[in-house]
Amino acid sequence: MHTIEQIFINGEFVTPHGTERFDLYNPATAQVIGQVRLADEVDAERAIAAAKAAFPAWSQTTKLERIAALKRMHAAVAARHDALLEAVIEEYGAPASRSAWMASYPAEVIAQAIEALEVFEFVTPAGAATVQMTPLGVAGLITPWNSDAGFICGKLAAALAAGCTAVIKPSEMSALQTQIVTEALRDAALPPGVFNIVTGRGETVGETLSRHPDVAKISFTGSTNTGKAILRNAAESFKRVTLELGGKSPTILLDDVDLARAIPLVIQAGFMNSGQACVAGTRILVPQSRKAEMEIALAQAVAAVKSGDPRESATEIGPMVSEKQWLRVQGYIRKGLDEGARLLAGGEGRPDGTRDGWFVRPTLFTDVNNQMTIAREEIFGPVLCIIPYQDEAEAVAIANDTEYGLSAIVLGRDTGRARRVAQQIVSGRVLVNTLAHEPKAPFGGFKHSGVGREMGEWGIGAFMEPKSIVG
């Protein structure tokens, strides 16, 4: 059993004022594997005070000093790779294909921030003026359970690169990852108060961060509903806010697509992170003229996807993170059937060969229209919908007929045509014949998928405001 009794404030591990214990589960077995003691509002206020006190000195550090600090962070986090790998399997149920990436990404995203900082221009001319990028102050960083260690490191690296100090509220469901990352960051020998990590509930620690007048910036990744609440709270003190929220991403298969090349990309995009990804391509738009052919190919591919023990090398989809999430996904599968969608693969219940744990059968629906619940709401599980279109214009219209706009994919043999389609999609990121990630490019959403951008120079700039000096 893992027992986590401390949080990190002002350069040291301390016992929280909060007394609530939160059970940690292994989702592959549905068994309790530990407990974490949660922080409360008092702890959050202590962390904010520490970050506020550290800000004047940190904001005056040079670019070279910040680069050196980030390099120490990178080395310390990279050294904990094996411990992170075990944690993401044990507390998250990530299969081998995903857990290897999740264990490497926290260090990788710090390295990406170092590259962005090395070329970032803090002072630029603008006519007769000089524009100086100025750090905002204390940043509240709120991270989700579906890639907690990576988000902690990515948001913190960008904030520190900009000259901000930080209070981090990680997901209480990811306490093992958080503990490992916190220990690593402590070993990086950053000045006390520059970063503080306070594990607690959103309605206590998160609420305090989003309302506190001494917090100048909030960077949040999570659900759209929580993002709306943060925006309302932040408005009271005019906080700057970056929100990376939900999605219902379309994958458009054009009528000239090579299915042998496209189907593996469709499956990987739809089922990434066991379907628990905001960018998952869960709406598969297919031309009516090739619908029958594509249904067969997709049904065969989904049926071949193995859901089960994350420690088995053949497993491609692990369990849902919690019983609550498992029940949510089951409810959406029932809703799809009730609304008249036709099941091509999967369905309710657990996959064959699994008895315990929160496993879901990889599921594929067809005869779906874009007004059905399963086509409009973010399910956050391995459930895909085939939606037919008559022509290219209708494909674009269906892709854009959503309150979300985080990510999209266009697959077709004619790359020029696919890029023209991509330009018409209202989304923060559109991938054309690839699933590659470009860390130098901005990442974030349109519409209800968020506010602002992360990654690259945009990620650093999000923690700053431009100051014009004339004369």
Task: Please tell me what each predicted stretch does.
Residues 1-127, 321:
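N-terminal Rossmann-like NAD(P)+-binding subdomain of aldehyde/semialdehyde dehydrogenases
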Residues 33-39, 54-60, 140-141, 251-254, ...:
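Short, well-ordered beta-strand elements within core beta-sheets of diverse protein domains
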Residues 55, 59, 74-81, 85-88, ...:
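Structural signal for hydrophobic packing residues in well-ordered secondary-structure cores
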Residues 120-261, 389:
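Rossmann-like NAD(P) dinucleotide-binding subdomain of oxidoreductase/dehydrogenase enzymes
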Residues 225-368, 432:
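ALDH superfamily catalytic-core signature
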